[in-house]
Design a protein with these regions (language model features):
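Structured alpha/beta or helical-core interaction and ligand-binding surfaces enriched in interleaved
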Residues: 1-144
Length: 144
């Protein structure tokens, strides 16, 4: 597993690059989100290494702040298989599924969607505070 870090995220990628069908990903690609302290997230991420390298999990990324969150990517057809891997790997906290690009599908489960976005917002604020969050967003906009 390769680890790549930028200003906001640490990516956990397979050792060997895999091609991605963009159309398939836009329609069916998503992620499991888990929120916890940074130390727990990093320990958990390293437990996913064999599953990322084997292709059972496409990839993962975690928020660099503390508290943190990890996104574990897969196609929706593998969603339940990946959830079982996460549970066996120690994901004790509530996890939530969210589509990456198929936003209309996210709205089919409004409670999960609201939980996901509220948790993301709180994680950013707890990690950086209000002023720090604004600076982070400003820097992130420069990076693209």
């Amino acid at each position: 597993m390769r680890i790549v870090k930028d200003i906001i995220w640490t990516w956990f990628l397979p050792d060997n690059e895999r091609s991605i069908n963009r159309k398939l990903w836009f329609d069916h690609g998503g992620k499991w989100l888990i929120f916890a302290r940074k130390k727990k997230i990093m320990e958990f991420a390293h437990q996913l290494e064999p599953f990322i390298d084997s292709g059972d999990i496409e990839s993962a990324k975690c928020w660099n702040g503390d508290p943190s969150a990890i996104n574990i990517y897969s196609l929706d057809c593998n969603r339940e298989k990946v959830k079982k891997i996460l549970e066996k790997s120690g994901a004790k906290k509530r996890s939530v599924w969210e589509y990456d690009y198929a936003w209309k599908k996210n709205l089919r489960n409004p409670i999960d969607f609201l939980y996901s976005w509220a948790s993301k917002f709180m994680t950013i604020l707890k990690s950086y505070g209000i002023i720090g969050a604004f600076h982070l967003f400003k820097e992130a906009m420069k990076a693209d």
